Every structure is written in structure tokens, then in C-alpha cells.
């Protein structure tokens, strides 16, 4: 599928700090860096302090002083000075800075990176993104333009499987992920924009919560009222059987702690759909396949994997039972033991 048509934005009303956690320099870094605008786009004059590589982190985790608050910026956030992306220090594109977040303690590496990025960001308007999808040339302009009429705005993810198990999960992710983000007031950390004052309990409380939990976008949803743009992004998912299984466990655990009632509903729905497919196979398979097909059509997902919805429904109860029984999961090279919303320990893999 292709991304939905973005909103055109000839001018930008406020400079944006884009936070991109990654341990490697990827195409996404270049894509976003190419979209940054200097002070001249906001009525100011360019200055030498915001030149190429200005303000990049020196490896201590502290900010450089070259950030220009009257311009867009990209903060590339890694865990350690030893991460491959840190080799770009001193050779960064214009208005790009490197931030070293440090090893996470009592939270996920992603949440820790976002908290560090929020501290380091020079602007009040902040966008989060990830490195696992393509950012077209007007990605940032469209997201920024959406903020003016909507306030905090998120785009909508479509998870595209890279291995057989990930492709098997696609119908479930379309219904429980794509559709849920679109209509449920859920922030997707891959493409969301907001201002610091939009955080209901203030930024300090938000950063404190990030540093004691796992899910960055789940935590943002707890602190922010957000609406979804009618625009999707294809997100690469999986690549190995084990990685896709760990992702499924992580996703279900996130909803378990951030939306327990929704999780209970999903479990009951999964059991009901499986029972229907077993007891009335013709009607059950037709209903489940039609539901998945309707969601695919709504979001322009041009993939045949909606036909896997019925087999997925049959396997949903044992898969959910497995995920709920798991006490740990692996994400980004770390094992997390997530006991409750704000009780997380990080263990070696």
C-alpha cells in the first residue's frame, strides 16, 4: 500500500523538535533531517551556531549549546557512546543533534530515550518518530500542519510483516492496532506531535512516569488527549519467528497494563470468535474474514493477509494465554520483567 495523501503545508507556524531513538544511523535519520527548517522559515535569521553538526552531544549525555530554539531540530537519541550512531558525532547534518540517554534503570530503553529527548529538546512543539518506516518529504510539514486545527495529532500505523508469523498477525494488528489508534484516542509513538503544555499533568510528571515503565506511547496516551490524522504509515514488523512472538507478547502486555478493560474485552472477543469459527465454521469464517477485509479497505491496506483472519481467530485464545502467562519479554536486546505499570526490571538476555 502507499501512504495516504498528506496535508500540504506551505508555512510552518512553530519550530518542532523531532525525537528519534535509534542506535544506528538509518535512512529515517536522513529523511527527517532533510525536512528540517531553519530560522528563516519562522521569520528569523539563520545563525552560525546552528550549522552542520552544531550542538551534537559530546558523549556525556549533556546537551551542546548549538541548538537554535527558532528552528526545527532532530534529536537522534541512543543509549550509549558505544552505539554505532555515536560514530556520527561531529559529522551530523544541519540542525541535527545527538543525545546519549544512558542505560535504562527501571524502565525500557525506548522510554528512557524519549525522556532524555524531552529534556534536551529546544522547542515547545515536539514530534516523536521511529526508524522503522519511510518518512516522505512532507512528513513533518503535514504533521505540523495538522496540529493547528486539531491540537495533538497522531498518524496511524499499519504493521507489515517481514516473516511468516508477523504476516499471520497482520489482521489482528490491523484491528487491534491500526483501527484502535484511528478511533480510540491512542498516541502512536512513531508519528505524533504535541506541545509541552498539552500534557495534562505537566512535563515533569510525564518524564517521571516514562522513567518507571515500558511503553512510551502508552504513557503518552495516559497524559495526552490526541486525535488521529487520516493518514497511515507502513511499519516494518518482525523478521524472525522469535522476534515476532516477542512483539506480540509486548503488545498484549502493554494493553494489559495501560488498558485492562480493553484487554479483557479483547480476550472475550477472541474466545467468542474462535468458538464461532469452530461451532459454525461457514458463518464464523465469513464474519471474521469480512471484518478484517473491511478494516483493510478502510485504511487502504492492499495486502491479501486479511484472508488469514480466520486461522488467526482460531489460534488467538492459546496465543493470548501464552502472552498473558509470560513474565518477561525481549525488546531491543534487553529482557524486561514488567510486574505492574510502574514496576519494571531490566535483565540480561
Predicted feature locations:
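Short, well-formed alpha-helical segments that are part of the catalytic scaffolds
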Residues: 2-7, 22-49, 63-69, 84-87
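Cell-envelope/extracellular polymer assembly enzymes that use nucleotide-activated donors
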Residues: 14-19, 73
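Short beta-strand/loop segment that forms part of the nucleotide-sugar
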Residues: 43-47, 70-83, 97-102
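Long helical/loop segments within the catalytic core of UDP-sugar-dependent glycosyltransferases
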Residues: 93, 99-116, 139-208, 309-318
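Catalytic donor/gating beta->alpha subdomain of glycosyltransferases that bind UDP-sugars
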Residues: 159-162, 168-169, 205-262
